[in-house]
């Protein structure tokens, strides 16, 4: 019984150590979520004004730009999947990968071939384990994305879309990422990025507001050539920021659940250890009483 008691005490000690780690990771994720939300909010004005500028050019000119041109027969699709670099985030990566599988099944049903692009080591490991080809992957920034990373990814996807005869030329570009709705809800989302469908925001001008007349210098084509790539990159950066906040929220929830489970295990092991200790004490008392009775019987027999 003493050996069993030592085992339970060792389990309690190891569980307490694990609880300290998960609690620390929960607090770190909570603090980073606030920063991730602030980054997303600070990037919103730029994205909003950029969308308005692109919408203005598209509305007040009749330019046919390659990034907005619908293909006559779409046959090849690029799919960017945004996962995490690290684990301990619950079902975060598996959920976005399931959404990517659903999208891939839908696209294959339409007779389209898929080129996979990945962000995050979890996506890399998923495809490597299944021996699935990946055109290109990026890692190292899933929880703290930079605009430079979005610029590199966006440039790669734009080049693949504009390339008409290359090995990895595509007719469409889709992005699968996790959208941050709230601390309790993160939603895997799939959106078509290219060809672009520029939509104005929900804000509408007031009835008495005078809408401006635009003049494009040097030309509407030149303005679009500069704005549209930035627009694509800003949307990718938005997806990265949303995914980062979602990853941190998922990690906080997972670590809180692990901490709560550790508390339950500690209570369980403590209760069992106390029962084992009480059983050991009871057995020792019984043995002492039995020994005393046996000694008394022996003395009575000798008399």
From Swiss-Prot:
One of its GO terms (biological process) is proton motive force-driven plasma membrane ATP synthesis. Disulfide bonds: none annotated. It comes from the Bacteria. Keywords: ATP synthesis, Cell membrane, CF(1), Hydrogen ion transport, Ion transport, Membrane, Transport. It is found in: Cell membrane. Produces ATP from ADP in the presence of a proton gradient across the membrane. The gamma chain is believed to be important in regulating ATPase activity and the flow of protons through the CF(0) complex. The keyword Cell membrane applies. Belongs to the ATPase gamma chain family. NCBIfam families: ATPsyn_F1gamma, PRK05621.1-2. This is ATP synthase gamma chain. One of its GO terms (cellular component) is proton-transporting ATP synthase complex.
């Amino acid at each position: 019984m003493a050996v069993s008691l030592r085992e339970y005490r060792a389990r309690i000690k190891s569980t307490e150590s694990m609880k300290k780690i998960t609690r620390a990771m929960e607090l770190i994720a909570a603090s980073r979520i606030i920063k991730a939300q602030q980054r997303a909010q600070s990037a919103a004005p730029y994205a909003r004004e950029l969308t308005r500028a692109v919408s203005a050019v598209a509305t007040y000119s009749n330019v046919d730009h390659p990034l907005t041109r619908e293909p006559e027969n779409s046959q090849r699709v690029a799919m960017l999947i945004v996962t995490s670099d690290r684990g301990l985030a619950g079902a975060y990566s598996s959920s976005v990968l399931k959404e990517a599988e659903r999208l891939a099944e839908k696209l294959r049903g339409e007779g389209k071939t898929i080129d996979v692009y990945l962000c995050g080591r979890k996506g890399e490991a998923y495809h490597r384990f299944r021996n699935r080809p990946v055109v290109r992957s990026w890692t190292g920034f899933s929880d703290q994305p930079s605009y430079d990373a979005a610029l590199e990814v966006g440039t790669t996807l734009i080049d693949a879309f504009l390339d008409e005869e290359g090995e990895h030329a595509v007719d469409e570009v889709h992005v699968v990422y996790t959208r941050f709705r709230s601390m309790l809800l993160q939603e895997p989302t799939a959106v078509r990025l290219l060809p672009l469908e520029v939509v104005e925001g929900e804000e509408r001008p007031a009835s008495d507001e005078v809408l401006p007349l635009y003049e494009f210098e040097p030309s509407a084509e030149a303005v679009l050539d500069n704005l549209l790539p930035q627009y694509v990159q800003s949307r990718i950066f938005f997806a990265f920021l949303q995914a980062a906040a979602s990853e941190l929220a998922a990690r906080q929830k997972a670590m809180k659940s692990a901490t709560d489970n550790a508390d339950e295990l500690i209570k369980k092991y403590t209760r069992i250890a106390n029962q084992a200790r009480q059983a050991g004490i009871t057995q020792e008392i019984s043995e002492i009483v039995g020994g005393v009775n046996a000694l008394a019987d022996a003395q009575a027999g000798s008399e």
